[in-house]
Structure formats: C-alpha cells, structure tokens
Amino acid sequence: MAWGNFCIVPCPWRIWDDTSRKQMLAMLPVLGLLMGALWYGLAELLLWLCIPKMLSAAVLTVYPFFVSGFMHLDGYMDCCDAIFSRAPLEKKKQILKDSRVGAFAVIWVIVLFLMLFASVYSFIEADASYMEF
C-alpha cells in the first residue's frame, strides 16, 4: 500500500484494506530503501554506459522526484509560497490551499534543483569510483 501511494513504479500487490493501512507507516523505511537502491542502480547503469557526467548528474537529480510522482515537490512549492509570502497566518493558510503556483515556489524550486544538481555533479566529478565496493 505504501508503494502504491508514494511511488509511480507499478506494484504487483493491490491490497487496500484496514490491515494494510495500519502497516503502511512501518513500511515507509523499506520503501525508502528500495527507492534508494533503484537510485543507486541507475547511477551504476549510467556509469557503466559511460554517459557524460553532466547528463548523469541531471538524470540523477530528477530521479527521486520522478519516482515519487513529484508529490513531495508539490508540497515543497506550496510551503515555500506560504512561508516566503510574509503574509499574516490566515493568508498563509489560504496560500497553502491555493492550487496556483506562486513566484516564491518557482524561485525556491529552481534553487532546490540547482543545489541538488551541483551536489550530484560534484559527487560524480570528484571520483566515480565511489560506487565500487
């Protein structure tokens, strides 16, 4: 159930009942481990295919957002709009419920992607042998 809610990769099990719902929270670390393993596998594949470092960094930057269906990115953008609006509390609550994207959301999502890209690229650039055991 956690896999189906938090990941776009198809899940072969489709059990949606109260028992599964109660266990979903306990399965989130397992889901994170699986998604991280897929991320690592993608990095290994890009390294094995000799994909240029810049392109590899771009793909690895987008992967965690893509595999989660961009769900967390949407929440991040909503929060940035509300927090940086410098509006009263009631107005911030309205901003959180608003489906439109504001300027602060756009600015901070660009900052987020640039920082993540720079981190991934510098990690790859430093030495790609980090993936070897």
Can you say where each PLM-predicted feature lies in the sequence?
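Glycine/small-residue-rich loop that forms an oxyanion/phosphate-binding "nest" at active or ligand-binding sites
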Residues: 74
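Hydrophobic alpha-helical transmembrane segments
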Residues: 1-69, 80-93, 98-99, 105-133
